[in-house]
Amino acid sequence: MIVVGVENDENFCRIRSQKYLFGDNKVLFVSRYPQSADLREWLIKIPNRYIHFGDFDLAGICIYQSEFYKFWGDRASFLIPEDIEERLKSGNTGLYDTQYLRYKNLKIIDSRLNGLVGMIHHYGRVYEQEGYIEKCAY
């Protein structure tokens, strides 16, 4: 079973409409909020892989690297959907501009993120995870 940490509470509350992002994998969704060390301490005790489902922006990448990848290395990964480049093309420029000053020198320690970070800077846009919530009837 793969543990998926969901950064945004709206996404967590409507997680069924985003299950498609994880294919046929058996997953356990957990909320990153409220922020505390409890989730990290629990993850340390179990052998499962961890996927971080957060915003596709520099702040989200910073959160993932400092709170998860730092502790588990390649046992942790950042969800990068197949269509993220198309979504970034029409993403949020204002949020990118706001974050750029703070995170422009962000050191990427998980090399699997180099492509995503390159796209973010290339388009000068970010994409919030709420965009992956599909409309569906429960």
Features from the language model and the residues they span:
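Glycine-centered small-residue hotspots that permit tight backbone geometry or close packing
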Residues: 59-61, 124
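A residue-level structural signature of the nucleotidyltransferase/glycosyltransferase Rossmann-like core
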Residues: 3, 76-77
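Acidic, glycine-rich catalytic loops of TOPRIM or P-loop NTPase phosphate-binding modules used
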Residues: 9-49, 59, 77-84
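Long, charge-rich alpha-helical interaction segments
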Residues: 79-138
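Short, aromatic/basic amphipathic alpha-helical patches
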Residues: 42, 63-71
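Terminal peptide-recognition signature
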Residues: 52
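Active-site cores of enzymes that catalyze phosphoryl transfer or operate on phosphate-rich substrates
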Residues: 3-10, 117, 126-127
